């Protein structure tokens, strides 16, 4: 088999892993889903080596990897060194998915297939969540989270003690295939703009599937009855208004309908739990107060990667929670102000790439708006939730980053090729200089 045939076979088999992971991982338990990324990368790297190809790393990937190295270094001063090292290595492992996507998705058709895979996976998760919520509202019984009983067994077998305990029976909010409703909401918020893009601007044969998936995703988010998720999805949908002016009205109606569903869901949840907004806010404030006291004791470098160190510190101040319920406060607690600033640098490069993609215009600009909606939704929900906590959250965040890098490369190459073709065309049309005989 010649080099080009081997390369084609290599890329095709590795891409199947990407599509499978994008669709299936969200439906699997937290301790199984990451294996898809790791197995896919092993196949990808091994076959890449056979063809003497080099893995290209984008700027975001390089900076993020540097951040993770700092995170791993924090295990030297961590309150929970083994846990910190394990969490840092998990982040690095999931980053491999980003490299795989950005190197293998090199054509628009492949990108559209990936969009569909993400959308269908999100639709399945949202559909399960919506079903759970409806059954709970009807006072019925249903597995919620879907893998809760297995989660409890697995977490008890961990080689180190952890504060987090698996939720076996969530009585009022949908968790779908995730550990709890807030983690589910974070995932769905990342996938919603992709599904909306697929419905509005994707391949015609997949638009209906993406549209149905988007509706199910919204239903799943509503089923979590999370106020933070409601705010995040609203911000995300507002950005998506700019993706297509002809369909802006339908998106606006969707925003209003979603707002109504969220309000009804939250009111119903409060009735069931006798749990009001004031009590919820007070709980968050107590957590954050404990975290700020902790951060003030070691402001620069924190207490080590992983939320277990934060949980231990909060417990010392009389607050028993598994993490800070805010990505930004959690990072400051784990890795100090230096780590938080490092994370903001990573986010800065992500925003730069998104803006660059939007400026390239054409169909690429629409995808850029979808990525902007993802990032804004993620940034908003991160204010009140620790959004990079679990393996699946990390896995999908990295896969989406890989998709952004792949899209940016394709857009730049497409623009460059168009520029070359235009120059050649202009050269042909320029009248040749008359040379007298």
State each model region's role:
Residues 21-22, 39-41, 72, 96, ...:
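Alpha-helical transmembrane segments of multi-pass inner-membrane proteins
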Residues 176, 180, 218, 289, ...:
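A conserved mid-to-late transmembrane alpha helix and its immediate loop/hinge
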Residues 1-86, 106-116, 145-153, 201-206, ...:
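Transmembrane signal-anchor hairpin modules in multi-pass inner-membrane enzymes, especially those
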Residues 46-48, 199, 206-210, 234-237, ...:
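Hydrophobic transmembrane alpha-helices and their immediate junctions
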Residues 172, 268-335, 359:
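Long extracytoplasmic/lumenal interhelical loops at the membrane interface
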Residues 76, 127, 131-139, 221-224, ...:
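A membrane-periplasm/extracellular boundary helix in multi-pass inner-membrane enzymes
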Residues 28-47, 88-97, 184-192, 230-238, ...:
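Membrane-embedded alpha-helical segments of multi-pass membrane proteins
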Residues 21-31, 74, 332-335, 366-406:
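Membrane helix-loop boundary segments at the extracytoplasmic
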């Amino acid at each position: 088999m010649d080099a080009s045939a081997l390369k084609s076979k290599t890329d095709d088999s590795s891409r199947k892993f990407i599509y499978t992971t994008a669709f299936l991982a969200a439906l699997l338990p937290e301790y199984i889903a990451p294996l898809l990324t790791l197995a896919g990368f092993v196949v990808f790297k091994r076959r890449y080596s056979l063809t003497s190809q080099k893995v290209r790393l984008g700027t975001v990937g390089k900076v993020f990897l540097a951040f993770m190295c700092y995170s791993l270094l924090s295990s030297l001063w961590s309150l929970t060194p083994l846990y910190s090292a394990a969490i840092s290595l998990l982040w690095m492992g999931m980053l491999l998915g980003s490299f795989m996507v950005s190197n293998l998705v090199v054509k628009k058709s492949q990108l559209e297939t990936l969009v569909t895979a993400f959308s269908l996976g999100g639709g399945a998760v949202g559909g399960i969540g919506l079903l759970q919520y409806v059954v709970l509202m009807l006072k019925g019984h249903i597995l919620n989270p879907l893998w809760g009983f297995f989660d409890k067994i697995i977490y008890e077998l961990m080689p180190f003690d952890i504060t987090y305990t698996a939720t076996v029976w969530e009585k009022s909010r949908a968790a779908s295939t995730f550990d709890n409703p807030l983690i589910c909401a974070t995932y769905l918020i990342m996938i919603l703009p992709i599904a909306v893009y697929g419905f509005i601007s994707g391949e015609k044969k997949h638009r209906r599937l993406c549209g149905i998936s988007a509706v199910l995703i919204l239903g799943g988010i509503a089923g979590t009855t999370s106020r933070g998720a409601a705010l995040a999805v609203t911000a995300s949908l507002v950005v998506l208004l700019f993706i297509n002016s002809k369909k802006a009205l339908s998106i606006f109606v969707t925003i209003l309908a979603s707002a109504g569903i969220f309000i009804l869901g939250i009111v119903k949840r409060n009735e069931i739990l006798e749990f009001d907004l004031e009590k919820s806010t007070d709980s968050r404030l107590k957590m954050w107060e404990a975290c700020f006291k902790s951060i003030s004791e070691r402001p620069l470098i924190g207490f080590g990667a992983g939320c277990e160190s934060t949980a231990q510190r909060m417990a010392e101040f009389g607050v028993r929670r598994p993490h800070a319920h805010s990505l930004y406060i959690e990072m400051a607690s784990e890795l100090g102000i230096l780590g938080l600033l490092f994370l903001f640098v990573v986010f800065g490069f992500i925003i730069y790439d998104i803006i660059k993609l939007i400026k390239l215009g054409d169909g690429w600009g629409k995808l850029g708006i979808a990525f902007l909606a993802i990032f804004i939704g993620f940034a908003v929900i991160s204010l009140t939730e620790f959004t990079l906590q679990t393996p699946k959250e990390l896995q999908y965040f990295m896969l989406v980053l890989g998709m952004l890098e792949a899209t940016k490369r394709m857009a730049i190459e497409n623009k460059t090729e168009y520029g070359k073709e235009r120059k050649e065309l202009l050269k042909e049309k320029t009248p040749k200089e008359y040379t007298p005989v």
